[in-house]
Curated annotation (Swiss-Prot):
Name under which the protein is recorded: Ketol-acid reductoisomerase (NADP(+))
Domain KARI N-terminal Rossmann: start-end pairs: 2-181
Entry binding sites for substrate: S251
Annotated source species: Staphylococcus haemolyticus (strain JCSC1435)
Residues holding Mg(2+) 1: D190, E194
Cofactor binding note: Binds 2 magnesium ions per subunit.
Record's signal peptide: none
Entry's Gene Ontology BP terms: isoleucine biosynthetic process; L-valine biosynthetic process
Cofactors, names only: Mg(2+)
Family, similarity comment: Belongs to the ketol-acid reductoisomerase family.
Gene name of this polypeptide: ilvC
EC number(s) on file: 1.1.1.86
Pathway: Amino-acid biosynthesis; L-isoleucine biosynthesis; L-isoleucine from 2-oxobutanoate: step 2/4; Amino-acid biosynthesis; L-valine biosynthesis; L-valine from pyruvate: step 2/4
Length: 334
């Protein structure tokens, strides 16, 4: 049975007296660094010169090039995009690790798929908040928290689990609760959720619904409202109380249509396709494709991105959002 750990579950403060280097100062980086600092820990930031470097300094941190930050630290939390972690690790982190250090991540991709292979004499652990960095920070300041996952890949010192739990508490996550997992489980479930449901699945579902209505002769604007704009109403209900809250809140007509038509759209074949997606994640095919495309300058990735940005639903949405000043519209720079 899944066990949840809270503040009172962390009996030993294994971070006490250790210097923590946060590598990266983006969404998660700023939240981890500030929460740990507010909890009294010795935190420095390692990052290359640029906007984030300046922002970390403005926020009161001692900021260093990555290599120097690693040299100074006992615990190194890597909070960089997946695609650049490998090179930064090889060139700036690995040469400066010492026996007994702890190397940490908020996502297991590069460890699980062996893009990064740490030496045997360092601890390797995971603390993965289940929410974006701005929410991790905001809830911490408010006295609550975002739940998180934690796990240990390598325990060189015999203290890796204690350190990971202490780190989770340090960023505030144990206020809400943390669940123990493995790098394998966190990575594979996270990638599957993104690809089959949250990003790949939902985007394709919305596009297909839009195309179906437009091809049948309905106005593009109405199609947009029905299959994309109103999605937020449903997701908010689901977020607050699950699918049963959606069905409680919608009309009987909508609920009946849910039961009789949902299975016609998401057929057993779709579930079989999901299983195939999961298999490609588990066997490393997806990771290999992503890593190779990254090494090739992301040619396929950028081509696919451009194709999707050109979909008709995007142009319709941009115009309709001008009619709704209550929406905090975000213009995406291409």
């Amino acid at each position: 049975m899944t066990k949840v750990y809270y503040d009172q579950s962390v009996e030993k403060d294994a971070l006490q007296g250790k210097k923590i280097a946060i590598i990266g100062y983006g969404s998660q980086g700023h939240a981890h660094a500030q929460n740990l600092k507010d909890n009294g820990y010795d935190v420095i930031v390692g990052i290359r010169p640029g906007h984030s470097f300046d922002k970390a300094k403005e926020d009161g941190f001692d900021v260093y090039p990555v290599a120097e930050a690693v040299k100074q630290a006992d615990v190194i939390m890597v909070l960089l995009p997946d695609e650049i972690q490998g090179n930064v690790y090889k060139n700036e982190i690995e040469p400066n690790l010492e026996a007994g250090n702890a190397l940490a991540f908020a996502h297991g991709f590069n460890i699980h798929f062996e893009v990064i292979k740490p030496p045997k004499d360092v601890d390797v652990f995971l603390v993965a908040p289940k929410g974006p960095g701005h929410l991790v920070r905001r809830t911490f300041v408010e006295g609550t928290a975002v739940p998180a996952l934690f796990g240990v890949q390598q325990d060189a010192t015999g203290q890796a689990r204690d350190i990971s739990l202490s780190y989770a508490k340090g960023i505030g996550a144990t206020r809400a609760g943390v669940i123990e997992t493995t790098f394998k489980e966190e990575t594979e479930t996270d990638l599957f959720g993104e690809q089959a449901v949250l990003c790949g699945g939902i985007h394709k579902l919305i596009q297909s619904g839009f195309e179906t209505l437009v091809e049948a002769g309905y106005q593009k604007e109405l199609a947009y409202f029905e299959v994309l704009h109103e999605m937020k109403l449903i997701v908010d209900l689901m977020y607050e109380g699950g699918m049963e809250n959606v069905r409680y809140s919608i009309s009987n007509t909508a609920e009946y249509g849910d039961y009789v038509s949902g299975p016609r759209v998401i057929t057993p074949d779709v579930k079989d396709n999901m299983k195939a997606v999961l298999k490609d994640i588990q066997n490393g095919n997806f990771a290999n494709s992503f890593v190779k495309d990254n090494e090739n300058g992301f040619k396929e990735f950028y081509k696919l991105r451009e194709q999707q940005h050109g979909h008709e639903i995007e142009a319709v949405g941009r115009e309709l959002r001008k009619m709704m000043p209550f929406i905090k519209s975000k213009s995406i720079q291409k």
